[in-house]
Amino acid sequence: MKKGLLILLCLPIIGFGQNVNIPDSNFKTYLVGEPLINTNGDTEIQISEANTFNGTIWCENMNITDLTGIEYFINLTSLYCPNNQIATLNTSQNISLTWLSCYDNQLTSLNLNGAIALEGLYAWNNQLANLDVSQNTSLISLVCNNNQLTSLNLSQISCALQINESDFSENPNLNCIEVTDLSCWQNHIGLIDTTYQYYSTNCNTTAIEEHTTNKKLLKVTDLLGRETKGTKNE
């Protein structure tokens, strides 16, 4: 009898533990209001609902400050969260994430280590001092201008990387981009802006072999990497 009573008392605790912790009320309101995410139509997001969702979360300009809970969306393919007040973002559990747009926030920390499928990162107009993309070997588009970057190491990126767009401009403290074992000339770079930076095989030495890059715009692409009509610069 006592054993059966103990099991019954534990059931509410077990049930509560199945809900995703989403402390930001604006983010939670968005998720609960999405029928493809909140499939049972209640007022919570269950872990099972988050785990099985394999679409896009689009929460632009919603006054969100915290994306805690995103880690349960392990099959999430795209995350668009620009124009918010997000300071930290951890996508290390989002192993299926291919596109991340987090520009126009207040990001000081961006963890991409587990997002091994990431192809496009758009993180301009933030406060990032460091950016580690060493595990994101599928990147084809990297735009992180207007941050506070002091270093950017692309050394672990495969030489087969098909980068077609990159912009590191307006990072006043970023002088060198380390590219050991990366040859930009073996890629298909269509747009690259390194107005205030140079490439080097060793950013820590005073005797630096500088590499220049042809900044001519070969094609104009949209945020999804698709070629669009535009004027090429000369």
Language-model segments: residues:
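Conserved hydrophobic position(s) of the canonical leucine-rich repeat
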Residues: F53-N54, L76, I86, L97, ...
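Extracellular, beta-strand-rich repeat scaffolds characterized by small/acidic residue-biased motifs
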Residues: E71, N83, Q93-I95, D104, ...
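Consensus "Asn ladder" position of solenoid repeat domains
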Residues: M62, N84, N105, N126, ...
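Short, intrinsically disordered, charge-balanced linker/junction segments flanking boundaries
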Residues: R226, T231-E234
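Canonical leucine-rich repeat
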Residues: L67-I70, L89, L110, L131, ...
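N-terminal capping/linker segments that flank leucine-rich repeat
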Residues: G4-S78, I95, I116, L154-C159, ...
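Conserved hydrophobic beta-strand positions in leucine-rich repeat
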Residues: G55-C59, L79-C81, T98-C102, E119-A123, ...
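Residue-level detector of functionally pivotal "anchor" positions at catalytic/ligand-binding pockets or at interdomain
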Residues: S200-E227
